[in-house]
UniProtKB/Swiss-Prot annotation:
Upregulating conditions: By maltose and maltotriose. Repressed by glucose.
Protein name per UniProt: Alpha-glucosides permease MPH2
High-level lineage: Eukaryota, Fungi, Dikarya, Ascomycota, Saccharomycotina
Listed GO MF terms: alpha-glucoside transmembrane transporter activity; carbohydrate:proton symporter activity; maltose transmembrane transporter activity
Gene: MPH2
Ranges per topology, Cytoplasmic: 1-106, 164-178, 222-234, 292-363, 419-426, 481-492, 547-609
PANTHER family: ALPHA-GLUCOSIDES PERMEASE MPH2-RELATED, PLASTIDIC GLUCOSE TRANSPORTER 4
GO biological process: alpha-glucoside transport; carbohydrate transport; maltose metabolic process; transmembrane transport
Natural source organism: Saccharomyces cerevisiae (strain ATCC 204508 / S288c)
Subcellular location: Cell membrane
Transmembrane segments: 107-127, 143-163, 179-199, 201-221, 235-255, 271-291, 364-384, 398-418, 427-447, 460-480, 493-513, 526-546
Membrane topology: Multi-pass membrane protein
Length: 609
């Protein structure tokens, strides 16, 4: 935090100033602060300060005004400091916050793992013979398209239910305990998958496991965005994508081993299910000791607990650390208080659509996450099955999948470097543009039946995975945490993720019909379809997706309130803490300047929080 010594001195000055009037009466001290009814109705951020003869003790009146103005000034200082904080300083100041965020996000490894093994099972010989049927034309064993669709629908339906349960659970017990409960249920539901003897049991197990996965999808992103400063926000929210990839890579390695050693044994599919018991217990213990989100605590009015939570995320000791805590709590208070004027007291799902501002924020968040499905990423999840249907051998299909996930991990790390030079929108849009081109090439190669074209289409799907994990895949986790207001963040993310799940269900059904030999049997020619859909997603991003890189939450709030267009978000500068007065035409940016005004009896000062 910059200028800590200055802030310490200012605090001391404020303390001494409060004792200037030990017993003397001031005739024109501010006696109350009010917001008129029309201002409240219009949702304007204007606080009306009336100056009139004070009937209360002068020192009490002065203290009230000083506290209100100091809170706003503290919020401004915290916001400016966060915006200008270098990455190295952020890591040095918030190392514990980064560590706690990484721990919570690790829960997504399990979702990435299980969803990947489900798609890989369709290419596993023992699974095909145990639960599938033989194709009369080709003689091959495979899981019917209807069952593939059913299993996919089950876990996605479970995720939708889990996401909806997450909202009230977080409101009731907070982020930490909600995650711990979800981990407990995941460990319990895994028994159903391990002891499965029919596709029906797998369907039930997938549906039940989907509920805790839905919880992980929402809370990992919101927790990372709320516990860390702006300089770390991109890295720690996009780490969620890395966790997905780690889980998928782990699954690909396990499935390749199963294909080699347990191709004719039930351990080929039981062992991958059993490995899901590794993480829940250690993760639950770690999350139990993690600090709660200070934003959630402030929303609940638990300010002392919010301060304790912030102390646990900061390094160092002494007055500097306490000032950091005070400034951050004041900033959170001011941000939430501003949002309360536009929404209901508690914040409900209906608030996400109540007014034009929140409707826009909700729409962008939902479509942004849905873009992860419409860009063709679901095809990457069925990569092993795709490679096999494109004519690649089963063993080579599993090898391609491992290479694909390794490329995805490298691409996500590369996106961290690229984020220093390009914005969120840039990475999102450029990634879609490259994916569109590659998908059309894959479709063209699918029109040929030569061995070279089959290997080429498989190789290019790895290129799609690379560009996807360089652009849209990681940046979405950051964008969906920045677009909603702080009071509605969890609920908006839940709506957005459920939008993604619904769109993913549709895309998964289409993919399974496109690849299954008993249905459309498109094979690599399906690249044409996903190229067109990816291009449509790109057009939406150009028109509607704002650039939020380098913007703090309070700045983003102000830009949305002003109705700034998507392409002007980056260049528009706002000061959410500016103070205006009708006595002067200039803008007053600190409460300290208010004391210098030649205030007269019954004069007004409008303070723009």
């Amino acid at each position: 935090m910059k200028n800590l010594s200055f802030l310490i001195n200012r605090r001391k000055e404020n303390t001494s100033d409060s004792n200037v009037y030990p017993g003397k009466a001031k005739s024109h001290e501010p006696s109350w602060i009010e917001m008129d009814d029309q201002t409240k109705k219009d949702g304007l951020d204007i606080v009306h300060v009336e100056f009139s003869p004070d009937t209360r003790a002068p020192s009490d009146s002065n203290k009230v005004i000083t506290e209100i103005f100091d809170a706003t000034e503290d919020a401004k200082e915290a916001d400016e400091s966060e915006r200008g904080m270098p990455l190295a300083t952020a890591l040095n100041t918030y190392p514990k916050a980064a560590a706690w965020s990484l721990l919570v996000s690790t829960t997504l490894i399990m979702e990435g793992y299980d969803t990947a093994i489900l798609g890989a099972f369709y290419a596993l010989p023992i699974f095909q013979r145990k639960f599938g049927s033989q194709n009369d034309k080709t003689g091959e064993w495979e899981i019917s398209a209807s069952w593939q669709i059913g299993l996919t629908l089950c876990y996605m339906a479970g995720e939708i239910v889990g996401l909806q349960l997450t909202g009230p659970s977080v409101d009731l017990v907070g982020n930490r305990y909600t995650l711990i409960i979800a981990l407990f249920f995941l460990a319990a539901f895994t028994f159903i998958l391990y002891f499965c003897n029919s596709l029906g049991m797998i369907a039930v197990g997938q549906a039940l496991c989907g509920m805790p996965w839905g919880c992980f999808q929402c809370l990992t992103v919101s927790y990372a965005s709320e516990i860390c400063p702006l300089a770390l926000r991109y890295y720690l929210t996009t780490y969620s994508n890395l966790c997905w990839l780690f889980g998928q890579l782990f699954a690909a390695g396990i499935m390749k081993n199963s294909q080699k050693k347990y191709a004719d044994s039930e351990l080929g599919y039981k062992l991958p299910f059993a490995l899901q018991w590794i993480l829940p217990v250690p993760l639950a213990l770690g999350i139990f000791f993690a600090p709660e989100s200070p934003w959630w605590l402030v929303k609940k009015g638990r300010f002392d607990e919010a301060r304790r939570s912030l102390r646990r995320t900061l390094s160092g000791k002494g007055p500097e650390k306490e000032i950091l805590v005070t400034l951050e709590v004041d900033k959170i208070k001011v941000t939430i208080d501003k949002e309360k004027r536009l929404t209901s007291k508690e914040g409900s799902y209906s608030d996400c659509f109540e007014d034009k501002i929140n409707r826009r924020r909700t729409r962008i968040t939902c479509l942004c996450w849905a873009g992860q499905a419409t860009c063709g990423s679901i095809l990457i999840g069925y990569s092993t099955y795709f490679y096999e249907k494109a004519g690649v051998s089963t063993e080579m299909s599993f090898t391609f999948s491992i290479i694909q996930y390794c490329l995805g991990i490298c691409a996500t790390f590369l996106s961290w470097w690229a984020s220093k030079y390009f914005g969120r929108y840039d990475l999102y849009a450029f990634g879609l543009a490259f994916q569109t081109i590659v998908f059309f090439i894959i479709g063209g190669l699918g029109c040929s039946s030569t061995h070279g074209s089959k290997m080429g289409s498989g190789s290019l799907l790895m290129a799609v995975a690379f560009f996807y994990n360089l652009g849209i895949a990681p940046v979405v986790f950051c964008l969906v945490s920045e677009m909603p207001s702080s009071r509605l963040r969890t609920k908006t993310i839940i709506l957005a993720r459920n939008t993604y799940n619904v769109v993913s269900i549709i895309c998964s059904v289409l993919i399974l019909y496109q690849l299954n030999s008993k249905k459309w049997n498109w094979g690599a020619k399906s690249g044409f379809f996903w190229g067109v859909l990816c291009f449509c997603t790109l057009i939406w991003a150009v028109v509607d997706l704002p650039e939020t890189a380098g913007k703090t939450f309070v700045e983003i709030n102000e830009l949305f309130k002003l109705g700034v267009s998507a392409r002007k978000f980056k260049s528009t500068k706002v000061d959410p803490f500016v103070v205006k007065t009708p006595l002067k035409t200039s803008l007053i940016t600190t409460p300290r300047e208010i004391s210098k005004l030649p205030l007269q009896r019954n004069s007004n000062v409008s303070h723009h929080l």
